[in-house]
């Protein structure tokens, strides 16, 4: 008896997906609830599990195919088990026992990430030389860099042993090698959506960016004094994102236009704050949403940001986790960015960019002092938000961070 495998419901407004990878081959045994195939939507990656135990009987949708919700992907034959082909005696006698590293690599069916594959090709590193740290053992760029840092021996190109006489190589023979320096990789659904949405935001909104700078001394001092006690009581580390989210929520109460959106000829003002927190992953940028952030304590915000961040990096975010945001915060500072002009996350009317904290000489009470400074950037939709409102919003965020007591006193 065969059981059909169909595309599950992928969430509100998501009608199709791309078949990313089949984890099993035809005839291979599968356990109940074992992932069979990976689907890529324009928002998340979804694994479709096997509803029964048996073997993969049929594959209908090939890797790279676009499928709609409830479309037939394949079928599993319930109760059947695949039979592994036993190696011949000659093969057994010739093949040496694989090392632990080779066993780990051979069992990994995930192809290396494109950036990792490029580095491996450039440095003549075999897949068997690397243990992947990504999802299901996928080799990531960081894994290759770690191997290179350890000085792994690369595999040199094979040289014919039939002659020791140097052989001249014509330019025509080099040409195919030069062509291999480029790589064409199909864009994932997520990357296509990122590209489309960012360009649509630029084309639709009257986008403008205003800047300010903030002295992080107060926040850093507060964090240093209470980080151990905070973690002991709440079970989560005290980071910077919690302070920024609280400061943003505080400023949005005073300037609701920055938390609004346009719908046709109407402006919708939101009396709540669903803060989108931009998270970088191997497959692209995603923006999970901290719902009702304005009603949360600092500890609750930090816990929710941590939870969503882990789901994002593991590729387990649900579509609902990324819907309904009213304002976005992005922190390019974790990558070393000194300043940027963030692009709006439509249909939102504002996005705040945080950046690297750098010690700079500042004039404080007529004296030169070294202070940890950060540039802030607010990109906003000028159709809704006036310049005065945008500047005031950024000043309020600055004031809350330089004097965190204002958040407690609601000033």
Curated annotation (Swiss-Prot):
Q: Name one GO biological process term.
A: L-lysine catabolic process to acetyl-CoA via saccharopine
Q: From start to end residue, where is composition biased (Polar residues)? A: 101-110
Q: Where is the Peripheral subunit-binding (PSBD) domain?
A: 111-148
Which principal EC class is assigned to this enzyme? transferase
Record-annotated Lipoyl-binding domain positions: 2-77
Q: Does the keyword Transferase apply?
A: yes
Which CDD domains does the record match to this protein? lipoyl_domain (cd06849)
Query: Which GO MF terms does the UniProt record name?
Result: dihydrolipoyllysine-residue succinyltransferase activity
- What cofactors are annotated for this protein? (R)-lipoate
What are the Low complexity biased-composition ranges? 82-100
Function, as annotated:
E2 component of the 2-oxoglutarate dehydrogenase (OGDH) complex which catalyzes the second step in the conversion of 2-oxoglutarate to succinyl-CoA and CO(2).
Q: Which NCBIfam families match?
A: PRK05704.1, sucB
Complex formation: Forms a 24-polypeptide structural core with octahedral symmetry. Part of the 2-oxoglutarate dehydrogenase (OGDH) complex composed of E1 (2-oxoglutarate dehydrogenase), E2 (dihydrolipoamide succinyltransferase) and E3 (dihydrolipoamide dehydrogenase); the complex contains multiple copies of the three enzymatic components (E1, E2 and E3).
Name of this protein: Dihydrolipoyllysine-residue succinyltransferase component of 2-oxoglutarate dehydrogenase complex
